[in-house]
């Protein structure tokens, strides 16, 4: 890990904490799109973010008018360097309260994902994991989402 990477983690974490303080005051309604991205070998792509702990599905926020499938693809381009993909479909939508936000999380299955990792301000590391042998350190919400989506494959 480079010096820049080492310094970025606490800066990004502090920025995320400030965002959460703002959400505590405002209690916004938000929309998220999260990709259950499978490689051609059926490996699940997970990311480790600089500002949050645990392995997570690639994803992020989107506007109310943006199609969640398009938002998931945008997030895959930004976070893992998406090059191409196969079938894409909505697995489910979940209403949840996260960090003082009322969030509608769209879980999107994206198959046959090909990507070329590149450096990112947001993503510290990318891995591929077998659905039968998920890595230690999954974020709790990620574990829950994987269980929900796996039942729909």
What annotation goes with each model-predicted range?
Residues 93-117, 125-127, 131, 145, ...:
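Active-site-adjacent beta-strand/loop module that shapes the phosphate/pyrophosphate-binding cleft
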Residues 39-78:
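Conserved Nudix-box catalytic region and its N-terminal flanking loop in Nudix hydrolases
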Residues 1-34:
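Acidic, metal-coordinating catalytic segment for phosphate/diphosphate chemistry
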Residues 37-38, 46, 110, 128:
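Conserved hydrophobic "DFG−1" position in protein kinase catalytic cores
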Residues 60, 131-132:
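Short strand-loop junctions, especially beta-strand C-caps/beta-turns
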């Amino acid at each position: 890990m480079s010096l820049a990477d080492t310094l970025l983690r606490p800066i990004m974490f502090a920025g995320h904490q400030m965002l959460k303080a703002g959400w505590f005051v405002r209690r916004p309604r938000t929309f998220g799109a999260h990709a259950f991205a499978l490689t051609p070998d059926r490996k699940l792509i997970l990311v480790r973010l600089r500002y949050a702990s645990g392995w997570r599905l690639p994803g992020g926020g989107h506007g109310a008018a943006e199609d969640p499938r398009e938002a998931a693809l945008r997030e895959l381009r930004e976070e893992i360097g998406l090059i191409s993909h196969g079938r894409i479909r909505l697995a489910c939508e979940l209403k949840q309260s996260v960090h003082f936000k009322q969030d509608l999380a769209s879980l999107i299955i994206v198959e046959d994902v090909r990507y070329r990792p590149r450096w990112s301000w947001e993503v510290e590391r990318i891995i591929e994991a077998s659905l039968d042998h998920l890595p230690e350190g999954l974020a709790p919400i990620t574990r829950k989402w994987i269980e929900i989506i796996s039942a729909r494959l």
